[in-house]
């Protein structure tokens, strides 16, 4: 299942009283913009009970062009990683166990 921003806004409208559809869309956009800008400034994000978004620098490494077999360098870059909290992992595992 994919959960879109529009679906998140719909959930907010359904579960929070006095929130309009437009307000919910703006809240969702502001939430993700805050995550984007915080990561762009080089900071990590920790959401209690959910997980951590971290920045990791990956060094340059050798790669290979699959068509030609030619060796090409893969440039150094910064990537975002997500590590789920123990609480989230436990909830997922509990749900998985109930489904089996």
From Swiss-Prot:
Disulfide-bonded cysteines: none
Q: Name one GO cellular component term.
A: cytosol
Molecular functions per Gene Ontology: DNA binding; structural constituent of chromatin
CDD domains referenced in this protein's UniProt entry, alphabetically: IHF_A
InterPro entries xref list: Hist_DNA-bd, Histone-like_DNA-bd_CS, IHF-like_DNA-bd_dom_sf, IHF_alpha
BP GO terms, sorted: DNA recombination; positive regulation of metabolic process; regulation of DNA-templated transcription; regulation of translation
User: Which key words are in the record?
Assistant: DNA recombination, DNA-binding, Transcription, Transcription regulation, Translation regulation
| Membrane spanning residue stretches | none
Keyword Lipid metabolism, does the record have it? no
- One Pfam family linked to the record: Bac_DNA_binding
List the SMART domains: BHL (SM00411)
Report residue spans for region: Disordered: 53-72
Note the subunit structure.
Heterodimer of an alpha and a beta chain.
Q: What family is reported?
A: Belongs to the bacterial histone-like protein family.
Q: What does this protein do?
A: This protein is one of the two subunits of integration host factor, a specific DNA-binding protein that functions in genetic recombination as well as in transcriptional and translational control.
Per its record, how is this protein called by name? Answer: Integration host factor subunit alpha
Natural source organism: Neisseria gonorrhoeae (strain ATCC 700825 / FA 1090)
Q: Which gene is this protein's source?
A: ihfA
């Amino acid at each position: 299942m994919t959960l879109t921003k529009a679906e998140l806004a719909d959930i907010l409208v359904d579960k929070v009283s006095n929130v309009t559809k437009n307000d919910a869309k703006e809240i969702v956009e502001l939430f993700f913009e805050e995550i984007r800008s915080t990561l762009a400034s080089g900071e990590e994000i920790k959401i209690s009970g959910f997980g951590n978004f971290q920045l990791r620098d990956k060094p340059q490494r050798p790669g290979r062009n699959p068509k030609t077999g030619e060796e090409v360098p893969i440039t150094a870059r910064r990537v975002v990683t997500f590590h789920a909290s123990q609480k989230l992992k436990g909830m997922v595992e509990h749900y998985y166990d109930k489904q089996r």
